[in-house]
Design a protein with these regions (language model features):
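Substrate-recognition/cap helix-loop segment adjacent to the acidic, metal-dependent catalytic center
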Residues: 82-83, 98-117
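Short, well-ordered beta-to-alpha junction loops that form the rim of enzyme active sites
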Residues: 92-97
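Short, flexible loop segments at boundaries between secondary-structure elements
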Residues: 115-132
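Amphipathic alpha-helical interface surfaces
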Residues: 67, 71-75, 88, 99, ...
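Conserved non-catalytic scaffold segment of RNase H-like nuclease domains
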Residues: 2-91
Length: 132
Protein backbone atom coordinates (compact mmCIF):
# COMPACT_ATOMS: atom_id res chain seq x y z
CA UNK A 1 0.00 0.00 0.00
CA UNK A 2 1.09 3.56 -0.50
CA UNK A 3 -0.10 4.40 3.01
CA UNK A 4 -2.67 3.44 5.61
CA UNK A 5 -5.75 5.37 4.46
CA UNK A 6 -8.10 3.68 1.97
CA UNK A 7 -9.52 6.28 -0.37
CA UNK A 8 -6.30 8.27 -0.29
CA UNK A 9 -3.77 5.46 -0.62
CA UNK A 10 -3.80 2.47 -2.96
CA UNK A 11 -2.81 -1.19 -3.10
CA UNK A 12 0.55 -1.80 -4.78
CA UNK A 13 1.06 -5.52 -4.11
CA UNK A 14 -1.09 -8.53 -3.34
CA UNK A 15 0.12 -12.02 -2.45
CA UNK A 16 -1.79 -15.01 -1.15
CA UNK A 17 -0.93 -18.21 0.69
CA UNK A 18 -3.38 -20.99 1.55
CA UNK A 19 -2.60 -23.03 4.66
CA UNK A 20 -4.34 -25.80 6.54
CA UNK A 21 -5.49 -25.51 10.16
CA UNK A 22 -1.93 -26.28 11.32
CA UNK A 23 -0.56 -23.47 9.14
CA UNK A 24 1.08 -25.94 6.77
CA UNK A 25 1.34 -24.45 3.29
CA UNK A 26 -1.18 -25.89 0.83
CA UNK A 27 -0.73 -23.49 -2.08
CA UNK A 28 1.16 -20.33 -2.89
CA UNK A 29 -0.71 -17.87 -5.05
CA UNK A 30 0.67 -15.24 -7.34
CA UNK A 31 2.65 -12.35 -5.85
CA UNK A 32 1.45 -9.44 -7.96
CA UNK A 33 2.90 -5.94 -8.04
CA UNK A 34 0.31 -3.45 -9.27
CA UNK A 35 1.20 -0.52 -11.49
CA UNK A 36 0.20 2.84 -10.05
CA UNK A 37 0.55 6.23 -11.69
CA UNK A 38 2.48 9.23 -10.40
CA UNK A 39 -0.59 10.76 -8.73
CA UNK A 40 -1.11 7.71 -6.51
CA UNK A 41 2.59 7.38 -5.74
CA UNK A 42 2.79 11.07 -4.82
CA UNK A 43 0.52 10.31 -1.84
CA UNK A 44 3.27 8.24 -0.19
CA UNK A 45 4.96 9.89 2.78
CA UNK A 46 8.74 9.85 3.21
CA UNK A 47 8.70 6.71 5.35
CA UNK A 48 6.74 4.65 2.82
CA UNK A 49 8.72 6.05 -0.13
CA UNK A 50 11.98 5.14 1.59
CA UNK A 51 10.76 1.64 2.52
CA UNK A 52 9.46 0.88 -0.99
CA UNK A 53 12.68 2.26 -2.52
CA UNK A 54 14.95 0.20 -0.24
CA UNK A 55 13.12 -3.07 -0.84
CA UNK A 56 12.83 -2.50 -4.60
CA UNK A 57 9.03 -2.36 -4.65
CA UNK A 58 8.87 1.19 -6.00
CA UNK A 59 10.90 0.19 -9.06
CA UNK A 60 8.67 -2.87 -9.53
CA UNK A 61 5.53 -0.69 -9.33
CA UNK A 62 6.85 1.56 -12.10
CA UNK A 63 7.77 -1.45 -14.28
CA UNK A 64 4.55 -3.39 -13.67
CA UNK A 65 1.81 -3.57 -16.28
CA UNK A 66 -0.65 -5.28 -13.92
CA UNK A 67 -3.80 -3.34 -13.08
CA UNK A 68 -5.62 -3.57 -9.77
CA UNK A 69 -8.51 -5.23 -11.59
CA UNK A 70 -6.25 -7.90 -13.11
CA UNK A 71 -4.52 -8.54 -9.77
CA UNK A 72 -7.90 -8.84 -8.06
CA UNK A 73 -9.19 -11.25 -10.71
CA UNK A 74 -6.07 -13.44 -10.50
CA UNK A 75 -6.24 -13.49 -6.71
CA UNK A 76 -9.95 -14.30 -6.74
CA UNK A 77 -9.40 -17.15 -9.22
CA UNK A 78 -6.66 -18.55 -6.97
CA UNK A 79 -8.92 -18.37 -3.90
CA UNK A 80 -11.82 -20.03 -5.72
CA UNK A 81 -9.52 -22.79 -6.95
CA UNK A 82 -8.55 -23.72 -3.38
CA UNK A 83 -11.57 -22.71 -1.28
CA UNK A 84 -14.81 -24.47 -2.14
CA UNK A 85 -17.15 -22.69 0.25
CA UNK A 86 -17.61 -18.91 0.27
CA UNK A 87 -16.96 -17.19 3.61
CA UNK A 88 -15.45 -20.33 5.14
CA UNK A 89 -11.84 -19.17 5.42
CA UNK A 90 -10.63 -16.22 7.51
CA UNK A 91 -8.10 -13.65 6.38
CA UNK A 92 -4.85 -14.30 8.25
CA UNK A 93 -1.70 -12.24 8.51
CA UNK A 94 0.03 -9.41 10.33
CA UNK A 95 -1.87 -6.19 11.11
CA UNK A 96 -4.60 -7.24 8.71
CA UNK A 97 -7.19 -4.76 9.90
CA UNK A 98 -5.62 -2.38 7.41
CA UNK A 99 -5.65 -5.08 4.73
CA UNK A 100 -9.38 -5.63 5.32
CA UNK A 101 -10.13 -1.92 4.92
CA UNK A 102 -8.21 -1.79 1.64
CA UNK A 103 -9.89 -4.96 0.36
CA UNK A 104 -13.31 -3.51 1.23
CA UNK A 105 -12.44 -0.28 -0.60
CA UNK A 106 -10.70 -1.63 -3.69
CA UNK A 107 -11.38 -5.38 -4.00
CA UNK A 108 -14.74 -6.00 -2.29
CA UNK A 109 -15.28 -9.30 -4.13
CA UNK A 110 -12.26 -10.71 -2.26
CA UNK A 111 -13.35 -9.17 1.04
CA UNK A 112 -16.81 -10.70 0.61
CA UNK A 113 -15.40 -14.11 -0.36
CA UNK A 114 -13.47 -14.44 2.91
CA UNK A 115 -15.00 -15.17 6.32
CA UNK A 116 -15.76 -12.10 8.41
CA UNK A 117 -13.43 -13.40 11.12
CA UNK A 118 -9.71 -12.78 10.97
CA UNK A 119 -6.57 -14.28 12.47
CA UNK A 120 -4.19 -11.41 13.10
CA UNK A 121 -0.76 -12.43 14.36
CA UNK A 122 -0.15 -8.89 15.61
CA UNK A 123 -2.78 -9.65 18.28
CA UNK A 124 -0.80 -12.70 19.37
CA UNK A 125 2.42 -10.65 19.49
CA UNK A 126 0.73 -7.98 21.61
CA UNK A 127 -0.71 -10.57 24.01
CA UNK A 128 2.69 -12.26 24.38
CA UNK A 129 4.27 -8.90 25.20
CA UNK A 130 1.70 -8.23 27.90
CA UNK A 131 1.44 -11.73 29.35
CA UNK A 132 5.17 -12.44 29.64
Amino acid sequence: MTGLEPGRHVIVEIATLITDDNLELIAEGPDLVIHQGPEALAEMDDFVTSMHTRNGLLEQIHASTITLEAAGAATMAFLQEHISEVRSVPLCGNSIGTDRRFLAQYLPEIENFLHYRSVDVSTIKELMKRWN
